[in-house]
Curated annotation (Swiss-Prot):
The keyword rRNA processing applies. It is an enzyme of class 2 (transferase). This is 18S rRNA (guanine-N(7))-methyltransferase RID2. Belongs to the class I-like SAM-binding methyltransferase superfamily. BUD23/WBSCR22 family. SUPFAM superfamilies: S-adenosyl-L-methionine-dependent methyltransferases. It comes from Arabidopsis thaliana (Mouse-ear cress). Residues 219-237 have a biased composition (Acidic residues). Essential protein. S-adenosyl-L-methionine-dependent methyltransferase that specifically methylates the N(7) position of a guanine in 18S rRNA. Requires the methyltransferase adapter protein TRM112 for full rRNA methyltransferase activity. Important for biogenesis end export of the 40S ribosomal subunit independent on its methyltransferase activity. Involved in the pre-rRNA processing steps in the nucleolus leading to small-subunit rRNA production independently of its RNA-modifying catalytic activity. Supports cell proliferation. Keywords: Cytoplasm, Methyltransferase, Nucleus, Repressor, rRNA processing, S-adenosyl-L-methionine, Stress response, Transferase. Disruption phenotype: Plants homozygous for the rid2-2 or rid2-3 mutation are lethal. Exhibits pointed leaves. Plants with double mutations in this protein and in AS2 have short filamentous leaves at high temperatures. Residues 243-254 have a biased composition (Basic residues). GO terms for molecular function: rRNA (guanine) methyltransferase activity. The lineage of its organism: Eukaryota, Viridiplantae, Streptophyta, Embryophyta, Tracheophyta.
Length: 289
C-alpha cells in the first residue's frame, strides 16, 4: 500500500479528528514542519527592514507552519480544506486568521493584498481527481490564477512539494507559468534520496534572477565515495524557468516567379482567363503613399 496520503483519501476525509490530532502531536512531524517552513520563509526573500508582512499559508493544517511566520514577526492567514485540522489550530490558539476552503476552486482573496505565500506539502494534492468533477489541470489553473491576482507586484510564493512523478512536476510548473508567474525549482540535497526536498519558487510580476540559498552549492570535484554520505552533505540544485514567449510564425516558403508561372499555367489548363506572361510577372510593386 502506498504511504502517500493523497492516494488514500481526499484531504478533508483523510485528515479527520483522529488524524489531525495525531499529526499535530507527533514531535517528528512538528520538527520537520518547522524546518520546511523556515526554508520556505528564507526563499521568500522578504526585505529585512523590520516591517511585518502579510503572508498567506496555503494548506496551513493545524498551524504548525504558521507558527514559524509568527515567530518571525509577520501577520498571516491560513487556508485549509480540513475542518478538523482548523479546529486543532483554533484549540492551539494560533495567531493567524483561518479560512476553510478548497484551493482548487480559487482563493477568493482581494487583488494585491498578500506580500508573500508559502505552502508545505499541499499543492500536490491538486494533481489527484478525488471527484468525478475534478480535473487536475483546471484546478491548478484556478489555484495559480487566483494566487497571482492576490499577490502584490514582485511578491514571491514558495511551495514545498512532493510530486509523485515527473509528469506531476511538469503539470504544476506548466500551470504556474501559464498563470503569469516566473521562477523555478529549488532542490535541496538533490543527490540524496531521503533528504531531497523540492521547492517551487515563483515571482509575481518582475522576475528576480537571484535566489538566496543557505545551503552549500554542490562541488562537482567531490569524489564518488562522498555520494554515500547523504546526511553530511548539504547541496542545492536550482533550475530557473521563465514563462515561454510565443514564437512568431515565419513563412519559410517564398513564392517566386517559377511558382507564379506554374500556377498560371494550371489555371490556363482549367480554361480560366489568365493575363499573359511578361517581364513584370511576379515582380514586387513599388510602395506608394
Amino acid at each position: 500500500m502506498s504511504n502517500r496520503p493523497e492516494l488514500l483519501a481526499p484531504p478533508e476525509i483523510f485528515y479527520d479528528d483522529t488524524e489531525a490530532r495525531k499529526y499535530t502531536s507527533s514531535s517528528r512531524i512538528v520538527e520537520i514542519q518547522a524546518k520546511l517552513s523556515e526554508r520556505a520563509l528564507e526563499l521568500l526573500a522578504l526585505p529585512e527592514d523590520g516591517v511585518p508582512r502579510f503572508l498567506l499559508d496555503i494548506g496551513c493544517g493545524s498551524g504548525l507552519s504558521g507558527e514559524t511566520l509568527s515567530e518571525d514577526g509577520h501577520h498571516w492567514i491560513g487556508l485549509d480544506i480540513s475542518a478538523s485540522m482548523l479546529h486543532v489550530a483554533v484549540e492551539r490558539e494560533v495567531e493567524g486568521d483561518l479560512l476553510l476552503g478548497d484551493m482548487g476552486q480559487g482563493l477568493g482573496l482581494r487583488s494585491g493584498v498578500i506580500d508573500g505565500a508559502i505552502s508545505i506539502s499541499a499543492v500536490q494534492w491538486l494533481c489527484n481527481a478525488d471527484k468525478s468533477s475534478h480535473e487536475p489541470r483546471l484546478r491548478l489553473k484556478a489555484f495559480f490564477g487566483s494566487l497571482y491576482r492576490c499577490l502584490s507586484r514582485g511578491a514571491r510564493a514558495v511551495f514545498q512539494v512532493y510530486p509523485e512523478n515527473i509528469a506531476q512536476r511538469e503539470l504544476i510548473l506548466r500551470q504556474a507559468l501559464q498563470a503569469g508567474f516566473g521562477g523555478g525549482l529549488v532542490v535541496d540535497y538533490p543527490h540524496s534520496t531521503k533528504k531531497r526536498k523540492e521547492f517551487l519558487v515563483l515571482t509575481c510580476g518582475t522576475v528576480q534572477t537571484s535566489i538566496q540559498t543557505s545551503k552549500n552549492e554542490y562541488d562537482e570535484s567531490c569524489s564518488e565515495d562522498d555520494n554515500s554520505d547523504d546526511e553530511e552533505s548539504e547541496e542545492v540544485g536550482v533550475s530557473d524557468r521563465n514563462r515561454p514567449r510565443k514564437r512568431q510564425r515565419t513563412n519559410t516558403k517564398v513564392k517566386g516567379r517559377e511558382w507564379v508561372l506554374r500556377k498560371k499555367e494550371q489555371s490556363r489548363r482549367k480554361g480560366k482567363n489568365v493575363p499573359a506572361d511578361s517581364k513584370f510577372t511576379s515582380r514586387k510593386r513599388r510602395t506608394r503613399f
